[in-house]
């Protein structure tokens, strides 16, 4: 650190208020400062690496040179506060508040039902708000683009986009291809005509309620900041922190002086590279130099032979500049510009593009850079400057590959980049393939250019650059040199492919894995470029240069990024229902406005408690090992550290029900908690945790995969089995028998709010109070009491809301709560325990990976006579929920099909991975995708459509399941029939077949899936529930129940129930929190039964109260509610009541293999249509139609939101979400960079959901639980992908080829799709002997 005297004041504005920081610390981010110093907790912490958008805020700056104010979104977790000098920051609190005025953006997000858990909502609001500040009348495409950097795990995005589209000047034209009237009107008529002719509705909200947007009412930019920006006497600023110094030069000479003095100091502009490297790679820099807003770095000149762009331009500004240039210049001059523009649309999200600069992007020379390969191919030059002078260097292969002779010298900076215009016979392209279309780093990207001799196809110059193939961007310079002078023809292409494979060869165990896929992508992307040039030549001279075959043109078309639209259809409320009765209405989430304003408080939003400490974890780095020693000396010596907590500090049990709180003597997985560090700040705790030294001695065996567990007979629980008929005998009397296996990998919950606990010890009676987000407060209470060795009545758990859960907060908060409580007990001080995203993913695990093996006997007609199934799940190292999950897998394994001879066996494997746990669908989504795989295989062998085989084998009449529970499948048949009809399945299937005949390199797939989903659990006492209702003397009602609000709208529905039962408006009813103090012994909120059981308890309590009030009401029937309550009090009538529901009487006898395991079933059907790019492995979901048996929906908006969100989450499970483990059991996917949940661009372009009405007498108001059912319907997407891939394989192999059983797996990632679409390029790829190398990652299913 330089020896400097004092620190300058940092001045910026937040929400119109001036902030002056006397001693700003360069290591403090804007997110931390907003939340901890300014107590603006609406801006959320979710990933810490700029990948999720939950911390989005708007930054505004005034440019003295252009005299303009620029508003742009940023991720506050990456913004150092020292970079904000002279800037204005707007957070969600500055946009609007329920205490003052809710902004139209916030209002519409809430009223369009765009919030569920609400954790991502402030970020969504800020992204749309910033867009409107720049474009008050945005296009739908701009709305979609603005949301591309924001992740949501709950809603499925559709309602969020819809809320943004309400601001568009020209509403999107209806694209549901129906003749005549608006699709909504026709859909309404058609829906009403089905079966019951009930009146169906399509409006989930009333847009006439929206307040108008008035841009003139937005806050003005602070005049003081304009004066600061225009100050002619600016000087260098110095900000001195605890460990680092921030230097902000005022002029270019000053910058060069600092660069010469501190040549190793990073230049900070957007901090999108340096920030994550500091946090995740442990880098440390004593000095930062930040040349923001220097005019010399912001030049833009498009005159002459090219474009000069200052290095200080953000990528968003670069995009704007290039769009302007492309619109003004002839197309042949803008080949490079258009290639860059194309990549800029999907590079990261809008927030990162607004922060990252061109200079930083060029100078870092990252292998995953999307722009550098294109810049290199376009012969870009870099203008460098230092104290010694100026020079220009080519941005070429030598520069990108890190050659010392071709890079920046000490003291130099990138001043600008010169992008030359292209010529008529020059062609430049940028190509990429990532795990998902937007906001994902490329697996492989490329920049390619060719300059042909004028008027010919002779190569004068060829440039090919690849990213993602090595540690740097690589140039195929040798191959390109050999091809100069050759003709641009098929022979040249073949030589180029062979040359590139020889020149750029990845080792088989290369970092990142996917070696064969990456090799294939090199050739596929080259082929796309080859075709593009061929077509361009044909357009220049059709006589001289023949066009490419028509069926090849699809290779040139990239999947468009459209704006999703669709319909939501549900049964209208009975017109005779009292107007104030809210049941059946699409009521807004009771906390929706608070979500949108950031005023809904989550655990980490709670104010700091006096003497509070922060907890950081030390986790095992070995999968199975003895702990030899734990050295805490260096950690304890660090400033701010109060204690290191180990197993020795646990007062009670350290191992409860097989779950270990702190590792003791040995570790059984990578990620197991060994110890924790408590310190005065999280930064100090985290630093100290990194200093704890743990010595291990490995233990064999180390079991990571299911296959390894089977080899060692390593299981967590006994086998479960159900069987009907005579399976072995039936196999002898069928036309054909096929066998296969399907691997289904796991899934990360990726709830937006990571596991968070605030544990507060009380001074007397050994009490402990915990605030946390959980689905099971009783379980937390049990584990904490056990760990502290106190009765449960000393432990109070408070749960107001969780920022998403999906099963991940059923058991894991109990273990983590015990860990935090032990720390609070040892230190005697409150403990705040917030897991970072990477630690959360590592420690808490997720959905069980599954291996399914099937044997199916069937007739030539497609009728299945016998099925024998074996399922194995990877349970991890401790029991957790694995036994219950495998029981669900077995019980649900038939899905919607009647197989007369059916056997299913299942077992949970014990491995050295973190214990997998409950996840939405609870085993059903993994197991039944295996069922659909064998349905598809049977169809292939019978030359039938899979849908024909599904319908043939579906339950058709009142029946009993394989475990002897009776049910009526009539709603299943109705959902199937309606979906078949209203999705126009057969017409679209014929259209897809026509498309596939005319398109070689893109294939269209269509699939329709039925579903019979179970609700609840086979254990009766898990269905009991209780509620507590107080009526106060002013007539207001306080409602409490045992269910947890996770975003699923449970509290909203409970208020609707109470409103109906008490006959009062919901505005009279308040629901605060779930607590073990008010409702004891509550069961978990899971299994889609939250409304079923808690609704019954609330109903019971309200009916008890109304029975007490009846004498008062009878005497004054026309009186008001308040009068009745006052009179009841005067008559000493109790105005408080508990409600209780004993539960559904379910049971399952595993010895007899029979039982009434579930209270009822939910039925549904979904149809999905996808396009697949056979060359890259990308896919595009074109349309999804969902028909869900909702019986009577208490709240159609909530239920449709649950269905859409579950469908998109299921789609993620089956496509983009891929967990990767090292062979030694280390999770490699630990953040937004490595794990890709769907974004707004992945959801269907057309998204139609219909709630089908039926009856369900066992549940409250004849409703059904719909929280999980939609998850499996996402499998319609993977089935459609299988259909498209099968079409590609059939075309390659020939129409007369023998039917095959496609070796399917889940997820169907770009890698699987591409390698399954075998062609001449996959045939060229060398295959390495697996026994000769250690792979970078492995499948654990």
From Swiss-Prot:
The keyword Kinase does not apply. It comes from the Eukaryota. It is found in: Cytoplasm. Binds 2 [2Fe-2S] clusters per subunit. It catalyses: an aldehyde + O2 + H2O = a carboxylate + H2O2 + H(+); retinal + O2 + H2O = retinoate + H2O2 + H(+). [2Fe-2S] cluster 1 binds at residues 47, 52, 55, 77. The active site is at residue 1268. One of its GO terms (biological process) is xenobiotic metabolic process. FAD binds at residues 267-274, 348, 357, 361, 370, 414. GO terms for molecular function: 2 iron, 2 sulfur cluster binding; aldehyde oxidase activity; FAD binding; flavin adenine dinucleotide binding; iron ion binding; molybdopterin cofactor binding; NAD binding; protein homodimerization activity. Pfam families: Ald_Xan_dh_C, CO_deh_flav_C, FAD_binding_5, Fer2, Fer2_2, MoCoBD_1, MoCoBD_2. Its EC number is 1.2.3.1, 1.17.3.-. CDD domains: fer2. Detected in liver, testis, kidney, brain, Harderian gland and olfactory mucosa. Residues 239-424 form the FAD-binding PCMH-type domain. [2Fe-2S] cluster 2 binds at residues 117, 120, 152, 154. Mo-molybdopterin binds at residues 116, 154, 805-806, 1046, 1087-1090, 1202, 1266. Residues 8-95 form the 2Fe-2S ferredoxin-type domain. Its main location: cytoplasm. PANTHER family: XANTHINE DEHYDROGENASE. Belongs to the xanthine dehydrogenase family. AOX genes evolved from a xanthine oxidoreductase ancestral precursor via a series of gene duplication and suppression/deletion events. Different animal species contain a different complement of AOX genes encoding an equivalent number of AOX isoenzymes. In mammals, the two extremes are represented by certain rodents such as mice and rats, which are endowed with 4 AOX genes, and by humans, whose genome is characterized by a single active gene. Homodimer. This is Aldehyde oxidase 4. It comes from Cavia porcellus (Guinea pig). The lineage of its organism: Eukaryota, Metazoa, Chordata, Craniata, Vertebrata.
């Amino acid at each position: 650190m330089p020896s400097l005297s004092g620190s300058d004041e940092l001045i910026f504005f937040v929400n119109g208020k001036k902030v002056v920081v006397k001693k700003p610390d360069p290591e403090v981010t804007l997110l931390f400062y907003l939340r901890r110093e300014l107590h603006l907790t609406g801006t959320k912490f979710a990933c810490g690496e700029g990948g999720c958008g939950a911390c989005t805020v708007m930054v505004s700056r005034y440019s003295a040179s252009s005299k303009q104010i620029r508003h742009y979104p940023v991720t506050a977790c990456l913004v150092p506060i020292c970079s904000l000098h002279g800037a204005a920051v707007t957070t969600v609190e500055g946009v609007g508040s329920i205490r003052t005025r809710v902004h139209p953006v916030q209002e519409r997000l809430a009223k369009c039902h765009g919030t569920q858990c609400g954790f991502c909502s402030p970020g969504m609001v800020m992204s749309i708000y910033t867009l409107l500040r720049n474009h008050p009348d945005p296009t739908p495409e701009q709305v979609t683009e603005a949301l591309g950097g924001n992740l949501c795990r709950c809603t499925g995005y559709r309602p969020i986009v819809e809320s943004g589209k309400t601001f568009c000047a020209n509403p999107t034209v209806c694209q549901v291809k129906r003749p005549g009237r608006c699709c909504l009107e026709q859909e309404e008529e058609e829906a009403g005509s089905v079966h019951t002719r009930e009146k169906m509705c399509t409006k989930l909200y009333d847009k006439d309620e929206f307040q108008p947007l008035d841009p003139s009412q937005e806050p003005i930019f602070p005049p003081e900041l304009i004066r600061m920006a225009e100050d002619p006497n600016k000087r260098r600023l110095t900000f001195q922190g605890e460990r680092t110094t921030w230097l902000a030069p005022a002029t270019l000479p000053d910058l060069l002086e600092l660069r010469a003095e501190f040549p190793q100091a990073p230049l900070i502009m957007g901090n999108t590279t340096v920030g994550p490297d500091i946090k995740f790679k442990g880098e440390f820099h004593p000095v930062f130099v930040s040349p923001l807003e220097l005019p010399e770095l912001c030049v833009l000149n498009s005159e002459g032979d090219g474009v000069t762009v200052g290095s200080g331009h953000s990528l968003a500004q670069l995009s704007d500049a290039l769009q302007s240039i492309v619109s003004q210049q002839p197309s042949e001059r803008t080949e490079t510009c258009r290639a860059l523009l194309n990549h800029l649309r999907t590079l990261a999200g809008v927030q990162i593009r607004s922060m990252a600069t061109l200079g930083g992007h060029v100078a870092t020379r990252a292998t995953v850079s999307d722009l550098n390969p294109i810049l290199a191919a376009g012969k870009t030059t870099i203008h460098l400057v230092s104290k010694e002078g100026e020079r220009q260097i080519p941005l070429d292969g030598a520069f990108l590959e890190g050659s010392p002779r071709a890079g920046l010298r000490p003291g130099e900076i990138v001043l600008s980049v010169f992008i030359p215009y292209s010529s008529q016979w020059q062609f430049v392209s940028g190509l990429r393939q990532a795990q998902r279309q937007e906001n994902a780093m490329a697996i492989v990207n490329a920049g390619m250019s060719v300059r042909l001799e004028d008027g010919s196809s002779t190569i004068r110059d060829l440039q090919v650059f690849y990213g993602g193939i090595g540690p740097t961007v690589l140039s195929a310079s040798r191959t390109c040199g050999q091809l100069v002078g050759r003709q641009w023809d098929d022979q040249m292409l073949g030589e180029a492919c062979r040359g590139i494979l020889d020149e750029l060869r990845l080792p088989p165990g290369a970092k990142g894995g996917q070696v064969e896929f990456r090799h294939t992508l090199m050739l596929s992307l080259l082929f796309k470029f080859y075709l593009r040039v061929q077509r361009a030549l044909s357009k220049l001279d059709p006589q001289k240069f023949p066009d490419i075959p028509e069926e090849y043109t699809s290779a040139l078309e990239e999947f468009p990024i459209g704006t999703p639209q669709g319909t939501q259809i549900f049964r209208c409320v009975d017109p005779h229902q009292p107007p104030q009765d809210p049941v059946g209405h699409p009521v807004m989430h009771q906390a929706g406005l608070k979500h949108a304003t950031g005023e809904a408080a989550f655990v980490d939003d709670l104010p700091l408690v006096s003497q509070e400490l922060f907890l950081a974890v030390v986790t095992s780095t070995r999968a199975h090992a003895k702990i030899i020693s734990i050295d805490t000396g260096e950690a304890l010596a660090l400033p701010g550290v109060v204690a290191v907590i180990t197993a020795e500090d646990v007062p009670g049990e350290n191992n409860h029900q097989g779950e270990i709180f702190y590792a003791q003597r040995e570790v059984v997985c990578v990620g197991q908690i060994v110890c924790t560090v408590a310190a005065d700040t999280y930064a100090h705790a985290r630093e100290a945790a990194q200093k704890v030294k743990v010595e291990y001695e490995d233990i064999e065996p180390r079991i990571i995969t299911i296959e390894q567990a089977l080899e060692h007979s390593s299981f967590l629980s006994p086998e479960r089995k159900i069987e009907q008929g005579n399976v072995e005998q039936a196999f002898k009397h069928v036309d054909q028998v096929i066998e296969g296996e399907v691997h289904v990998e796991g899934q990360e919950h990726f709830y937006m709010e990571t596991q968070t606990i605030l544990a507060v010890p009380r001074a007397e009676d050994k009490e402990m109070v915990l605030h946390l987000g959980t689905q099971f407060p009783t379980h937390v209470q049990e584990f904490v009491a056990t760990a502290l060795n106190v009765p449960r009545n000393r432990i109070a758990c408070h749960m107001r809301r969780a920022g998403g859960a999906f099963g991940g907060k059923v058991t894991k908060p109990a273990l983590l709560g015990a860990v935090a409580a032990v720390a609070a007990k040892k230190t005697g001080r409150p403990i705040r325990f917030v897991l970072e995203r990477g630690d959360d993913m590592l420690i808490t695990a997720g959905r069980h990976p599954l291996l399914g093996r099937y044997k199916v006997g069937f007739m030539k007609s497609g009728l299945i006579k016998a099925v024998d199934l074996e399922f194995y799940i990877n349970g991890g190292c401790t029991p957790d929920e694995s036994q219950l999950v495998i029981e669900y897998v077995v019980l649900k394994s038939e899905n919607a099909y009647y197989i007369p001879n059916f056997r299913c066996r299942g077992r949970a494997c014990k491995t050295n991975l973190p214990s997998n746990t409950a996840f939405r669908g609870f085993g059903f989504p993994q197991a039944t995708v295996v069922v659909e795989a064998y349905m598809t295989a049977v169809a292939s062998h019978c030359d039938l459509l899979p849908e024909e085989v599904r319908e043939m084998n579906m339950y058709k009449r009142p029946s009993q399941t394989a475990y002897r529970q009776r049910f009526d499948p009539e709603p299943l048949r109705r959902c199937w029939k309606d979906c078949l009809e209203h999705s126009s399945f057969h017409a679209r299937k014929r259209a897809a077949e026509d498309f596939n005949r005319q398109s070689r390199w893109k294939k269209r797939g269509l699939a329709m899936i039925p579903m019979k989903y179970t609700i609840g659990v086979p254990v009766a006492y898990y269905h009991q529930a209780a509620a507590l209702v107080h009526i106060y003397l002013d007539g207001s009602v306080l409602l409490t129940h045992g269910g947890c609000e996770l975003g699923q709208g449970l509290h909203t529905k409970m208020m609707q129930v109470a409103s109906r039962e008490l006959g009062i408006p919901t505005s009279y009813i308040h629901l605060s929190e779930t607590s073990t103090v008010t409702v004891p012994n509550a069961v978990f909120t899971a299994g889609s039964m939250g409304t079923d059981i808690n609704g019954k308890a609330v109903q019971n309590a309200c009916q008890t109260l109304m029975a007490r009030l009846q004498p008062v009401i009878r005497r004054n029937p026309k009186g008001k509610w308040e009068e009745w309550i006052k009179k009841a009090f005067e008559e000493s009538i109790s105005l408080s009541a508990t409600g209780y529901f004993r539960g559904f009487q379910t049971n399952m006898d595993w010895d007899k293999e029979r039982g009434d395991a579930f209270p009822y079933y939910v039925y549904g059907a979904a149809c999905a249509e996808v396009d697949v790019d056979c060359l890259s492995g990308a896919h595009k979901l074109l349309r999804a139609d969902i028909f869900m048996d909702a019986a009577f929906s208490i709240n159609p908006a909530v239920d449709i939101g649950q269905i859409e969100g579950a469908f998109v989450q299921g789609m993620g499970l089956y496509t983009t979400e891929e967990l990767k483990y090292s062979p030694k059991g280390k999770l490699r996917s630990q953040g937004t960079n490595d794990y890709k949940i769907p974004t707004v661009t992945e959801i269907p372009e057309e998204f139609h959901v219909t709630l089908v009405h039926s009856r369900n007498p066992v549940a409250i108001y004849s409703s059904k639980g719909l929280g999980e059912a939609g998850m499996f319907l996402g499998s319609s997407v993977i089935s459609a992908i299988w259909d498209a891939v099968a079409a590609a394989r059939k075309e390659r192999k020939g129409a007369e080829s023998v039917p095959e059983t496609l070796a399917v797996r889940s997820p169907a990632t770009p890698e699987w799709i591409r390698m399954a679409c075998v062609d001449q390029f996959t045939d060229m790829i060398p295959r390495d002997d697996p026994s000769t190398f250690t792979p970078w990652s492995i499948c654990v299913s």
